[in-house]
A protein has these predicted regions:
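Acidic/glycine-rich C-terminal interaction modules and beta/coil loop segments
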Residues: 3-103
Length: 103
């Protein structure tokens, strides 16, 4: 995996916004050294309104980024479109590199 244990942090998923990929109460391993946005990867992000959130970052066709929940219910979990450069105004805490949960 090529990670330094000093850069790893364990957090717990809350809610159903990332189902079916990540379930409520799953254990997540976050690599705090990987804070640059990468298309299609899942990150822990600090939101002033919501605290720490776990979402997928998707590059937009409109020169920006989308903060996306994996849950298909877009009425409850709508995409958040960030114009180019605005993604850097959010504090990316690290990339989620592993998850563990109940079978």
């Amino acid at each position: 995996m090529g990670v330094n244990p000093k850069n790893l942090k364990v957090i717990y998923a809350e809610g159903s916004s990332m189902e079916p990929t990540i379930n409520n109460h799953d254990v997540l391993l976050v690599d705090e050294s990987r804070v640059d946005p990468v298309d299609g990867h899942i990150f822990a992000i600090y939101s002033e309104n919501k605290g720490t959130i776990v979402k997928r970052l998707v590059m937009s066709d409109l020169d920006g980024w989308i903060i996306r929940s994996d849950n298909a219910d877009k009425t409850r979990y709508a995409d958040q479109v960030l114009p180019d450069g605005e993604v850097y105004e959010h504090r990316i805490l690290g990339r989620v590199i592993w998850r563990g949960g109940e079978l």
